[in-house]
Amino acid sequence: MSYKKSKYFLIARKRRIKYFFLNKNSQITVVFFHGFMSDMIGAKPKEIQKFCNKNNLNFLKFEYSGHGKSTGEFTKGNISKWTKEAKELINSKLKKKNKLIFIGSSMGSWISLNLFPVFKKRLKGFIGIGSAPEFLEHLMWKKFSKKIKKIILAKKIYNLENGDFTYPITKQLIFDGRKNKVLNNKINLKIPLVLLHGTNDKVVPLSFSRAILKICKKSKKKFVIIKNGDHSLSRKSDLKKICNELRDIVNNIRLA
């Protein structure tokens, strides 16, 4: 999918955040949060956008600074900064009366969880896809060797190789992640909460989705374990499941 009809949102007078807003004049807006070093033009946002267009729902997607076509250096980004960017964009582009449904992919679920308290009165549903809250500490730092940790602590960039991708990891990224812990907090929102996770996810264990379920005490929870699904959950069958769950949440909101 291309960046057709996307625009830039200016933050702090210098960071330009790439975003796309589908305005169907609906009372419901679906917001998509992409993952670590990902973008807004993949299969999931594409399919969700098509669903929203067909079902008369507003849809907002965007790219954090240092990602995709947004400006800024990736190595200067962190969870706090990306959360703030998402908050400012949502507040600027969406009407205050809009009911929100957040969809977080991998790291996007962490950003979403950070924003639960901010939008608690408007948030009416959440879908997490291969959710990875606090992954910087549990999937990176704790597994790094002493040699790698020494490189990072010396304020150097460690390039983490993962398949075809290279992730530049910095000290400030790791340390900022520790300021954004969410798994020790209780979430008391009474909203539909659906977590989808593939059994063949080699990046993020199922336990991360289970951890979210544990802290959401009052939500109407559903855990969808997808057989043979990988981390991206971008097969046609995966995308259909995601949109089916979204449809259920939307129907519940409209019937309320």
Each language-model region and where it sits:
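Short beta-strand element of the alpha/beta-hydrolase
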Residues: Q27-G35
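Short substrate-entry loop that stabilizes the transition state in hydrolases
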Residues: M37-A43
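Short beta-strand immediately N-terminal to the catalytic nucleophile in serine-hydrolase-like folds
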Residues: F102-G104, I129
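N-terminal cap/lid segment of alpha/beta-hydrolase-fold proteins
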Residues: M1-K24, R235
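Gly/Ala-rich beta-loop-alpha elbow adjacent to hydrolase catalytic centers
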Residues: G104-S112
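Catalytic nucleophile-loop/oxyanion-hole region of alpha/beta-hydrolase
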Residues: H67-L94
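The alpha/beta-hydrolase serine catalytic core
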Residues: K14, W110, R122-I226, D230-A256
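Conserved alpha/beta-hydrolase
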Residues: P45, Q49-T71
